[in-house]
C-alpha cells in the first residue's frame, strides 16, 4: 500500500520543525543568559542548577516517557486487543515512573551533589564496580536512543515514504543543535513545548472521535461499531474488543512493564531529572508526571486506535475493505490511519507531528544524559580528575555531537538487520533489567559488596537470556529465530527471570563473601561539584541538605502510592476483569471513555499552565529586563560572591553539612533525654 502522505511531509517536518526548535532554543538560551545571568557553566549544563520546580519536572517526565512506542504501540495494542490495550499500556508505563519516584527521592536525599547515579557506584565500589555499572548504564542509553530513532524513522518511512536512513540522521539533527547550545535547562523548556503540542492534538482527536465526528460521535456508537466489527474480524484469540479476557495481552503487558523498568532505573536520562529538580519538587513532579502520562496512551489508543478498528467496515477506512497487514500493525500505523479516517490527510499530518515531538523530546533527554555520563563518569573520573569547568562543558558538547551521529548510524544498522522497535524493547529489558536491583541495592543496602555487583548483575543477564531462549524452544516446537523469540510467554519468562535472579545473586554473594566493614551511605555526599559552580547552584545543594525531613516523609508516601497502583490498578482490576469472562456493558464502556475525556483535560491544564504559574516571577523578570534592558542581578548566598573560588564554595557546602550534622546530634540527644 502507498504511504498515506508524500515524502515532503517527512522531510519538511524533520528539517523544518527541527530547525525551528533549534532556533527557538538558541534564542531562549540567549535570553536566559542576558536577562537572568544564567551563563552555561558545567553544573548548569548537566544539572540545570538543581532548582527545577515540580511543574517542569512533570512536563519533562511526560515528554521523556512519551516515546514513539507510546503513541504507536498503544494504538496498535488497542487495534489488536481492544479497550484493554491502551489501558494496560498506560498502567504498565505509569508504575515504572512511580517506582522510580521512590529511587529519585533517595538520590536527592543521599547524594545531593551528584551529576549522575553512576557517580555513586564510583564512590562505593571503586573503578571495577563503577565500570560494570557504566556498561549497563551506557548500554541502556545507547539502546533506548536507538529504539527512539528506530521506531520514529520506521514510522516516518511507513507514513510518508521517507528514506529510513535519511530519517535516522535528520530527526536528531535539530535536537543535537539545541541540546548542545542550551544543555539540560533548554531540554526542560523544549520538553514543555513538545508536551503542550502533543496534548493539544490529543484533546482534539479524543473529543472529535467521541463528541462531534459524523462517523462515530459518541461512546455508545463506538461500542456498537466494535460489536459489529467483532462479528466480521474477531479479536486475537477469539475474544472481544470490549473485554479484558485475553491472556496473551496480559503476558505482553507484564513483559513490557518489567523490561521497561531497566529503561527507567538504568537510563541516566530519568535520574538527570531527579538530580535537576528542587528537593521539595521531586515527589510532586514525578507523581503528577506519571498520572498525566497515563492518559496519553490510554486516550490515544481508545480514540484513534479503536477508531481504526471500528471503521474497518466503513469506506472512510484507509484500508477499506481490508484489515491492516501485520507489517502495518507492527509499524504502529493504526493511530495514523485512525486519525486519517476521522480528519483526512490533516489527521495523518497531525499524527506525524505528535510522532516528531515524541522522537525529539525523548532523544534530547538521552543526549544530555549521555553527555553527563561521559563528562563526569569517564572524562573526570579516569582521564582528567582535575578538569575545570570549561573543559567539562567542552567534553559535554562533543559528547552530544558524537552520540547523535553514533545512534543515527546504529539505528540504520538495526533497520537493515530487520529489527523492529518492539523487538529491541524486549531485548533491552532481558539483558539490562539486572541494573534495577543493582542501583536500588547500591543506594539502600549498606552490606552490598563490590564482588556481588561485579558477578551478580552479569549472572542475572546470563540467566535471563538462557531462560528466554529455552522458553522459546519449548513454546515454539524447537524453533528459535528472530521471530519466535518474540513469543509473549517466552519474553515474559526472560524478563521476570532476569529481574528476579540478579538481586538473589547480589544478596547471596554479599552474605557469603561480605566486606570487613559495611559501607557508610553518607559517603555519597562526598561527590564534588565543578569549580565553576555559582552561588545559585550552591544554594540549591545546601537547601537539599535542609529538606531531609520532607524527603523522608515523601519516601513513605511513595511506598503507599506504588502499592496502590501496582496491586490495585495493575493486578486486581485487570485480573478481576479477566476472570469475569464478560464484555464491558455499554454504560461501563461509556463511563470509562468519559473518565478519559475528563482526565485528558485536567492533565493538559496541569502540564500546560502549572509550570507557567510556578515560573511567573522568572517570566516577569525576563520581560522586565527585555523592556528596560537592565543588566542581570546576581543572587548571593551567605556573603559569597559569584566569582569566588571552588575552594570557598566547597568550604561553604562543608559548613552547611557540618551544621546539619550537629543539629541532628542535638536533636537525638534531646530525644534520648
From Swiss-Prot:
One of its GO terms (biological process) is urea transport. This is Probable urea active transporter 2. The keyword Disulfide bond does not apply. Pfam families: SSF (PF00474). Its main location: endoplasmic reticulum. Involved in active transport of urea. InterPro entries: DUR, Na/Glc_symporter_sf, Na/solute_symporter. It is a multi-pass membrane protein. The chain crosses the membrane at residues 8-28, 83-103, 132-152, 164-184, 196-218, 249-269, 287-307, 336-356, 391-411, 424-446, 451-471, 492-512, 559-579, 592-612. It comes from Schizosaccharomyces pombe (strain 972 / ATCC 24843) (Fission yeast). One of its GO terms (cellular component) is endoplasmic reticulum membrane. GO terms for molecular function: putrescine transmembrane transporter activity; spermidine transmembrane transporter activity; urea transmembrane transporter activity. Disulfide bonds: none annotated. Keywords: Endoplasmic reticulum, Membrane, Transmembrane, Transmembrane helix, Transport. It is found in: Endoplasmic reticulum membrane.
Amino acid at each position: 500500500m502507498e504511504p498515506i502522505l508524500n515524502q515532503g511531509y517527512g522531510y519538511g517536518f524533520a528539517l523544518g520543525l527541527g530547525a525551528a526548535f533549534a532556533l527557538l532554543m538558541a534564542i531562549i538560551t540567549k535570553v536566559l543568559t542576558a536577562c537572568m545571568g544564567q551563563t552555561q557553566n558545567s553544573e548548569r549544563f548537566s544539572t540545570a542548577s538543581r532548582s527545577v520546580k515540580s511543574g517542569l519536572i512533570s512536563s519533562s517526565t511526560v515528554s521523556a516517557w512519551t516515546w514513539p512506542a507510546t503513541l504507536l504501540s498503544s494504538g496498535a495494542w488497542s487495534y489488536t486487543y481492544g479497550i484493554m490495550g491502551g489501558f494496560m499500556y498506560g498502567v504498565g508505563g505509569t508504575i515504572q515512573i512511580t517506582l522510580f519516584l521512590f529511587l529519585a527521592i533517595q538520590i536527592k536525599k543521599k547524594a545531593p551533589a551528584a551529576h549522575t547515579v553512576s557517580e555513586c557506584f564510583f564512590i562505593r565500589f571503586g573503578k571495577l564496580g563503577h565500570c560494570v555499572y557504566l556498561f549497563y548504564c551506557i548500554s541502556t542509553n545507547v539502546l533506548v536512543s536507538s529504539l527512539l530513532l528506530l521506531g520514529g524513522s520506521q514510522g516516518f518511512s511507513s507514513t510518508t515514504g521517507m528514506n529510513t536512513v535519511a530519517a535516522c540522521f535528520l530527526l536528531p539533527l535539530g535536537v543535537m543543535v539545541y541540546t548542545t547550545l542550551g544543555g539540560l535547562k533548554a531540554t526542560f523548556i523544549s520538553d514543555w513545548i513538545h508536551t503542550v503540542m502533543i496534548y493539544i492534538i490529543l484533546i482534539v482527536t479524543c473529543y472529535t472521535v467521541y463528541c462531534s465526528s459524523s462517523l462515530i460521535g459518541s461512546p455508545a456508537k463506538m461500542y456498537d461499531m466494535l460489536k459489529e466489527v467483532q462479528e466480521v474480524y474477531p479479536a486475537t484469540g477469539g475474544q472481544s474488543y470490549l473485554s479484558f479476557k485475553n491472556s496473551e495481552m496480559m503476558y505482553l503487558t507484564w513483559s513490557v512493564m518489567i523490561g521497561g523498568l531497566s529503561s527507567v532505573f538504568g537510563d541516566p536520562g530519568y535520574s538527570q531529572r531527579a538530580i535537576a529538580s528542587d528537593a521539595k519538587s521531586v515527589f510532586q513532579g514525578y507523581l503528577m508526571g506519571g498520572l498525566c502520562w497515563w492518559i496519553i496512551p490510554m486516550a490515544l489508543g481508545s480514540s484513534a486506535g479503536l477508531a481504526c478498528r471500528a471503521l474497518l467496515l466503513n469506506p472512510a477506512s484507509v484500508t477499506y475493505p481490508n484489515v491492516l497487514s501485520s507489517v502495518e500493525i507492527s509499524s504502529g500505523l493504526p493511530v495514523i490511519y485512525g486519525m486519517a479516517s476521522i480528519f483526512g490527510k490533516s489527521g495523518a499530518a497531525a499524527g506525524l507531528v505528535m510522532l516528531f515531538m515524541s522522537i525529539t523530546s525523548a532523544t534530547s533527554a538521552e543526549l544530555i544524559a549521555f553527555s553527563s555520563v561521559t563528562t563526569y563518569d569517564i572524562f573526570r573520573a579516569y582521564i582528567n580528575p582535575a578538569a575545570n569547568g570549561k573543559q567539562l562543558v567542552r567534553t559535554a558538547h562533543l559528547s552530544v555531537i558524537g552520540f547523535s551521529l553514533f545512534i543515527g548510524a546504529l539505528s540504520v544498522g538495526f533497520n537493515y538487520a530487520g529489527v523492529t522497535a518492539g523487538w529491541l524493547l524486549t531485548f533491552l529489558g532481558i539483558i539490562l533489567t539486572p541494573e534495577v536491583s543493582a542501583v536500588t541495592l547500591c543506594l539502600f543496602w549498606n552490606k552490598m559488596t563490590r564482588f556481588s555487583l561485579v558477578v551478580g548483575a552479569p549472572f542475572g543477564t546470563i540467566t535471563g537470556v538462557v531462560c528466554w531462549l529455552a522458553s522459546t524452544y519449548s513454546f515454539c516446537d524447537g524453533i528459535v529465530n528472530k521471530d519466535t523469540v518474540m513469543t509473549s510467554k517466552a519474553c515474559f519468562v526472560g524478563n521476570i527471570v532476569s529481574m528476579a535472579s540478579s538481586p538473589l545473586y547480589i544478596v547471596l554473594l554479599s552474605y557469603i563473601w561480605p566486606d570487613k566493614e559495611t559501607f557508610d551511605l553518607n559517603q555519597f555526599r562526598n561527590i564534588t561539584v565543578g569549580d565553576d559552580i555559582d552561588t545559585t547552584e550552591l544554594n540549591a545543594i545546601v537547601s537539599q541538605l535542609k529538606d531531609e525531613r520532607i524527603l523522608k516523609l515523601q519516601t513513605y508516601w511513595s511506598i503507599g502510592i506504588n502499592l496502590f497502583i501496582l496491586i490495585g490498578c495493575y493486578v486486581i482490576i485487570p485480573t478481576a476483569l479477566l476472570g469475569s469472562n464478560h464484555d464491558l456493558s455499554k454504560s461501563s464502556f461509556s463511563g470509562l471513555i468519559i473518565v478519559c475525556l475528563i482526565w485528558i483535560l485536567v492533565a493538559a491544564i496541569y502540564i500546560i499552565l502549572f509550570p507557567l504559574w510556578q515560573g511567573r516571577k522568572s517570566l516577569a523578570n525576563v520581560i522586565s529586563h527585555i523592556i528596560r534592558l537592565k543588566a542581570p542581578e546576581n543572587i548571593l548566598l551567605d556573603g559569597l560572591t559569584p566569582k569566588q573560588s571552588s575552594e570557598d564554595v566547597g568550604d561553604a557546602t562543608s559548613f552547611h553539612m557540618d551544621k546539619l550534622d550537629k543539629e541532628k546530634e542535638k536533636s537525638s540527644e534531646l530525644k534520648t533525654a
